[in-house]
């Protein structure tokens, strides 16, 4: 088994490492299933005390998330609830020592002041930056900023130039009065690969499932090693129970609809829209990338999926595809530990010496891999089969594309051109295996990669 991700978690003002771990609540418990979370304590002693006669000041101090007996520390000095940014260099040296002892770390989660110092830290460590006297550590693969902000003093501008290129997820509260959306927006503007999740709360780490899975999916969208040197556009293809966005139950599909299954097979097999066959190649084959549980759920007679290159994403280096010792390894079936590794494997196995030309690359599930692909910079398209019936499910697609500003629905002619086969338009009557009549609809969405879309989410109306 490969090692789990290691994540550096930086607390906010008047907190400590243990307090932040506790304040993360169910998020910490959930993420700990997938990663090692480490919680250092800042070196700045916070002596902030509220005037006992000032209720507003008491509420504001409580909102910062400290605990009476939990220790009160920070990463910057503060006066009258405003960051002076004193001791920032001491804090970086403290973090550096912790990283040398406990690291290296794959990524960072920072809350409030922890996000503020974390943004500086990530920028100093990103590729292409000159050596600095404060921190020595490999670049982070991802950063998550909750209630994050940019230091507003001009002497700190060098921490935001050039822009942070490390993939960043910004989680901000629409009711946050301590770090308003306008301040979070200033940080997003200095991040080149930014994603934004908004929650309706105040200055907190939101506990709802969508944010827990969002952080997890974002962390695992980062490549386990170097980003692929052989980029190809990725297309997610999924059938979804609407409106609950269910995609499975007990690791199997809760419906069996002939038209839906035929559409999936035809689209992922068709190479009509993959261009001309190159000289020296005998055929074009598409790639289907899936999670281990998704592959294991396929009927054995259908594994691997015929006439397609199958790649299973698993961190188990001993995964054997469910084969017995006597069974021969099928052709065009491989394992990789992440999407980027899968693309590198495709380039290695189907290069100039191969007679097979690679067509489209599809992400076919399950929910964990969909979540990772959602944040992957190479994901450009989503083929969304909407089943207009709500089935009981225990796994779900991570978002509704029709309600997302990051995705734009394409016209039906564009759908047909993209898949290369005729597709019926609108809501179609179909029958499930138990003769129950349902309606299905085939949709195509294109991803909007413009960072201004993320900034629009943080606009103040």
UniProtKB/Swiss-Prot annotation:
GO terms for molecular function: ATP binding; dihydrofolate reductase activity; lysophospholipase activity; NADP binding. Pfam families: DHFR_1 (PF00186), FSH1 (PF03959). The keyword ATP-binding applies. Substrate binds at residues 260-265, 308. The keyword Transferase does not apply. Keywords: ATP-binding, NADP, Nucleotide-binding, One-carbon metabolism, Oxidoreductase. It comes from the Eukaryota. Its EC number is 1.5.1.3. One of its GO terms (biological process) is tetrahydrofolate biosynthetic process. InterPro entries: AB_hydrolase_fold (IPR029058), DHFR (IPR012259), DHFR-like_dom_sf (IPR024072), DHFR_CS (IPR017925), DHFR_dom (IPR001796), FSH-like_dom (IPR005645). GO terms for cellular component: cytosol; mitochondrion. Residues 233-447 form the DHFR domain. Pathway: Cofactor biosynthesis; tetrahydrofolate biosynthesis; 5,6,7,8-tetrahydrofolate from 7,8-dihydrofolate: step 1/1. NADP(+) binds at residues 239, 246-252, 292-294, 314-316, 365-372. Belongs to the dihydrofolate reductase family. PANTHER family: DIHYDROFOLATE REDUCTASE. This is Dihydrofolate reductase. It comes from Schizosaccharomyces pombe (strain 972 / ATCC 24843) (Fission yeast). The gene is dfr1.
